[in-house]
């Protein structure tokens, strides 16, 4: 997938950059959500009513007023209704700009993060900054649902194709949660692989699992940001499967000390940020 927009030409992603030595909020770079939503026809009205881009930031450090380095982990949730998503390399460079800057308290750092990310996203952003002692007790979890990956099928086409989902439902009405660890897409700018686990929770006519798995695997050579892939999956399932209720949730492996976990639903609230085995 290719988008033409001035905001993409200005991104630091894929370019050689220098790391800032002092706090600099201008390093954050937005990507308008409408770039993807225009192609899906959902710019003005989205088919999901709940959602966020859930980030975990593992590499946050700054100096206290005595010059002693401090470290923390942050949970960040960017509301799906924000005007922009935040480009990941710029987020990394922004976080690194804290490294040699002095702040009095955890709360001060958290306030800067919340304000700067909200301004960049042009929407609601929540930030929770945690000491490492808190994360020592965080479990590694599994996404609830039945894994559909162990199917005895042959795959020979890895080009994105939503038409795979044509006639993808059976008459039986179900309420189920399905999981696949085989989601792989590629960065829109750099083509680097993005690895994810996908959860689909729905109520409606039963979705054919073979067709669903083939559809998921068709993302393997597809170029889009994480958030855009999840919204595309949601829209394709609504178009072809027409469930009464639908949640699409992907948790991607981390890169540059950040993982991105987009969540979209038309019936349930954003979950807590809990990491998986590959995170």
UniProtKB/Swiss-Prot annotation:
One of its GO terms (cellular component) is cytoplasm. GO terms for molecular function: preQ1 synthase activity. GO terms for biological process: queuosine biosynthetic process; tRNA modification. It is found in: Cytoplasm. This is NADPH-dependent 7-cyano-7-deazaguanine reductase. The lineage of its organism: Bacteria, Pseudomonadati, Pseudomonadota, Gammaproteobacteria, Pasteurellales. HAMAP family: QueF_type2. Its EC number is 1.7.1.13. Catalyzes the NADPH-dependent reduction of 7-cyano-7-deazaguanine (preQ0) to 7-aminomethyl-7-deazaguanine (preQ1). Pathway: tRNA modification; tRNA-queuosine biosynthesis. Belongs to the GTP cyclohydrolase I family. QueF type 2 subfamily. It comes from Pasteurella multocida (strain Pm70). Substrate binds at residues 86-88, 226-227. The active site is at 187 (thioimide intermediate), 194 (proton donor). Homodimer. Keywords: Cytoplasm, NADP, Oxidoreductase, Queuosine biosynthesis. NADPH binds at residues 88-89, 255-256. It catalyses: 7-aminomethyl-7-carbaguanine + 2 NADP(+) = 7-cyano-7-deazaguanine + 2 NADPH + 3 H(+). Its main location: cytoplasm.
